[in-house]
Amino acid sequence: MSSLVVINPNSSQSVTDGIDAAVDPLRSFGVPIRCLTLAEGPPGIESQMQADQTIAPMLALAAAQTDAAGYVIACFGDPGLHALRD
């Protein structure tokens, strides 16, 4: 079954764990949801340069998710959104 992939574009596993807990109630609808941390990302995204630096590794991470039905970028400003749509 295809899954919804939520990508935390920073490298903070604790942030990803919080996101995973927040989306947990949505799993009751039967759609598998996987939350991933971008290990190559900065610890936090506080500038445009940091946001831009996440794009290439996020595209690689997304491409590796062969069962993804869709993606959510779990970050204010949606870094890489337009690149991920291509």
How does the language model describe each region?
Residues 55-86:
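Glycine/small-residue-rich loop that forms an oxyanion/phosphate-binding "nest" at active or ligand-binding sites
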Residues 1-57:
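N-terminal glycine-rich anion-binding loop in soluble enzyme alpha/beta folds
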